[in-house]
């Protein structure tokens, strides 16, 4: 189940640099990526069905997914306090049985918080798995809970910054990170503004169909496959907002080593290049769950000024510093089970257990 949830969290995968962007050759080169010559093909899913009720999905191999989705719909209807309690218990269980991911998260915390004692990091690790379990319920709420169930739970701060950026008419890159609250945070934003979500299509056609269906239903705009440069630029020309989170490791291609928690970290550089190519404003936003059952706050910050600066490395480092600041506010709610430091500078040792 931990692997399922981890892969789910990667579903909103913004990594424009992992695979060559598809669209115009000139545009792809301006972003700094290769062009593969086929603007229509998304090879991750071959001809996924567009309807949820499809005879293919009655095959036994899809039954576990149907069961999981059914449980998530039930979870979304539970009282909020029950969700927090049950989610926390599930997360703690995942932390005990998901030994590999627990070791990865522990390695990440040791790298990023060397100033904390081993006991403090162990406590933070337990809190992280609690947040992961709650994140399952938050995902269910994001997809299936009615608005009236959620309105009293969320406070959006700084909505005027998003409105001002959209008023420019050149589109907005809604910049964030992979927090356990990411699906619910995006749902809260859509109350103010429809948005596209950059994501990597899922290999399983049933999960891909459900994921696209629910995100489009709530976001009011279709998700964009991460290699669809043409669709991305079209959205910006229409003055639309696009969800984007450049904080995961996908290798050296179109990446650079810049500091993140003081560690040279392989980081996608496409944010700066996309902003330069499209003229879109970059508006950071960060959702966070409040202590107890107090709900959520979504902090929308002013559009980044003097961005892009013309220095891609400086721009990328600026984004990492911004992410680090907000991760430190709620460190347990960041996705530490991802191997963020997998790609290392030449001569540097592997930081993760085998």
What name fits each language-model region?
Residues 3-5, 29, 35:
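Short, positively charged and aromatic/hydrophobic N-terminal segments
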Residues 13-14, 18, 36-38:
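Intrinsically disordered, low-complexity polyampholyte segments enriched for Lys and acidic residues
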Residues 36, 41-43, 49-51, 56-59, ...:
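Non-catalytic C-terminal accessory region of glycerolipid acyltransferases
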Residues 36-176, 181, 208-213, 219:
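Membrane-anchoring hydrophobic helices of lipid-metabolizing enzymes
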Residues 167-227, 249-261:
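Catalytic core of membrane glycerolipid acyltransferases/transacylases, capturing the structured
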């Amino acid at each position: 189940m931990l692997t399922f949830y981890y892969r789910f969290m990667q579903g909103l995968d913004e990594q424009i640099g992992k695979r060559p962007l598809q669209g115009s050759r000139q545009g792809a080169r301006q972003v700094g990526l290769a062009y593969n010559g086929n603007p229509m093909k998304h090879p991750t899913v071959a001809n996924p069905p567009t309807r949820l009720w499809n005879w293919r999905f009655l095959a036994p191999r899809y039954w576990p997914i149907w069961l999981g989705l059914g449980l998530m719909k039930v979870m979304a209807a539970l009282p909020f306090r029950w969700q927090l309690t049950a989610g926390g218990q599930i997360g703690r269980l995942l932390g005990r049985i998901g030994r590999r991911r627990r070791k990865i998260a522990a390695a990440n915390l040791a790298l990023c918080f060397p100033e904390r004692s081993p006991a403090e990091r162990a406590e933070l690790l337990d809190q992280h798995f609690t947040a992961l379990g709650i994140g399952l319920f938050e995902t269910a709420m994001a997809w299936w809970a009615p608005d009236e169930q959620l309105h009293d739970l969320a406070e959006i701060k700084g909505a005027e910054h998003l409105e001002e950026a959209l008023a420019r008419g050149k589109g907005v890159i809604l910049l964030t990170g992979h927090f356990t609250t990411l699906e619910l945070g995006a749902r809260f934003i859509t109350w103010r503004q429809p948005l596209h979500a950059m994501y990597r299509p899922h290999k399983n056609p049933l999960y891909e169909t459900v994921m696209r269906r629910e995100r489009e239903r709530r976001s009011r705009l279709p998700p964009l496959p991460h290699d669809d440069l043409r669709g991305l630029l079209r959205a910006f020309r229409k003055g639309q907002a696009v969800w984007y989170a450049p904080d995961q490791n996908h290798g050296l291609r179109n990446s650079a080593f810049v500091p993140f928690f003081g560690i040279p970290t392989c980081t996608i550089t496409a944010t700066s290049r996309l902003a330069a190519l499209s003229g879109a404003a970059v508006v950071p936003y960060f959702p966070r769950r409040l202590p107890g059952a107090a709900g959520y706050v979504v902090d929308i910050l002013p559009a980044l000024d003097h961005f892009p600066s013309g220095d891609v490395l400086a721009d990328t480092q600026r984004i990492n510093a911004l992410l680090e600041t907000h991760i430190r506010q709620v460190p347990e709610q960041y996705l530490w089970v991802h191997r963020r430091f997998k790609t290392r500078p030449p001569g540097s040792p592997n930081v993760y257990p085998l």
